[in-house]
Regions:
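Tryptophan-paired
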Residues: 63-98, 170-201
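Short, surface-exposed alpha-helix to beta-strand junction/turn motifs within ectodomains of secreted
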Residues: 52-69, 161-175, 268-295
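Intrinsically disordered, low-complexity segments of exported/surface proteins
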Residues: 1-32, 264, 271, 275, ...
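Non-catalytic beta-sheet/beta-sandwich ligand-binding modules that flank or precede catalytic cores
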Residues: 87-97, 191-199, 205, 252-295
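Functionally constrained cores in energy, signaling, and assembly domains
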Residues: 1, 7, 26, 51, ...
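The feature marks proteins involved in alpha-glucan
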Residues: 15-49, 83-157, 186, 194, ...
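Extracellular beta-sheet repeat scaffolds used for adhesion and glycan interaction
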Residues: 76-80, 113, 119, 181, ...
Length: 295
């Protein structure tokens, strides 16, 4: 069985970072610019406060794998070189010319793998940052507290006036006076944004984007409901213009990957995916290829 091809949808309208003085927008104006061909890895917390004792060991689609810089474990890049930001610390890593995946781990001078093997999927040529939380979970955006979800809304025209969100599902304090939704914060990293408090063990959310300058059904920017059902794994959602898809990354890529397969019978295979909210069963069947390993 071969893995599915990543179902990718890119756009020239991928949002650029919007600078802001609002700390809730999760930006850090003091950071140095990211060089072309480089990805910045932000770490929320390191396994030790002694940064000089820790190293970042990298392989796969990097310009120079750590194994070419020196033997294990000394070929790793020392965290003594890491710089501070609002999230924690960060290191920049040069990528290969056509990167798809950066694999890494954090080790120490004794050669202990402290983080386990981790990977950053390079979702888009524009992707130049990734965030790693204290449990070494990797994100394509800066994660927010687990009891909230952030909806990011990108408009090509940049007009966020009178725009709001009407939401329901596993949320707290849902709006109830239609069509008076909750207003977006206009100056986020990826356009406008809204942080929504969630109920305990929240799984799903539904929402509508509203233009409160209009009346009747015209108040709905997109006529159909947006729905998402994997809040346990996802901290931020991304929508744009009148696109009907809810994306889980700021590059508007349908990041659906096969994570496991088990043959249940001669005619039946059970497949596991990263998520299915961004794709239809027809898309899966179209992209899926099953091959005989002996042929």
């Amino acid at each position: 069985l071969t893995e599915t091809t990543k179902l990718t949808e890119t756009s020239e309208n991928t949002p650029k970072t919007v600078s802001t003085n609002n700390s809730q927008a999760l930006t850090n104006a003091s950071e140095e610019p990211i060089a072309e061909g480089t990805i910045r890895l932000h770490f929320q917390e390191l396994p030790s406060q002694d940064k000089a004792s820790l190293g970042l060991w990298t392989w796969d689609d990097v310009e120079t794998p750590s194994s070419q810089k020196g033997a294990w474990p000394t070929g790793a890049t020392s965290f003594a070189e890491a710089k501070q930001d609002d999230y924690g610390v960060y290191l920049d890593v040069k990528l290969s010319s056509t990167p798809k995946k950066l694999s890494f781990l954090i080790n120490n001078a004794a050669g202990t793998n402290l983080s386990g093997d981790k990977a950053v999927e390079i979702l888009s040529p524009q992707m130049n940052e990734a965030w790693i939380d204290k449990d070494f979970q990797v994100y394509s955006y800066q994660p927010i507290p687990q009891d909230h979800v952030r909806i990011n809304y990108f408009r090509t025209d940049g007009d966020y006036g009178n725009k709001s969100v009407w939401y329901w599902g596993d949320v707290k304090d849902a709006p109830s006076n239609w069509p008076d939704g909750v207003n977006f914060q206009p100056n986020g990293k990826y356009g406008a944004y809204l942080d929504i408090p969630l109920t305990e063990a929240a799984k799903s959310i539904g929402f509508l984007l509203l233009d409160e300058s209009k009346t009747g059904d015209d108040v709905k920017i997109q006529a159909n409901d947006y729905k998402f059902s994997d809040l346990k794994k996802t901290r931020q959602l991304f929508v744009r213009d009148t696109d009907t898809t809810v994306y889980t990354n700021p590059y508007f890529v349908k990041d659906v990957r096969l994570t496991g397969a088990q043959q249940l019978s001669p005619s039946k295979i059970e497949l596991s995916f990263t998520n299915l909210d961004e794709v239809s069963s027809e898309d899966i069947l179209k992209e899926l290829k099953v091959t005989d390993k002996d042929r």
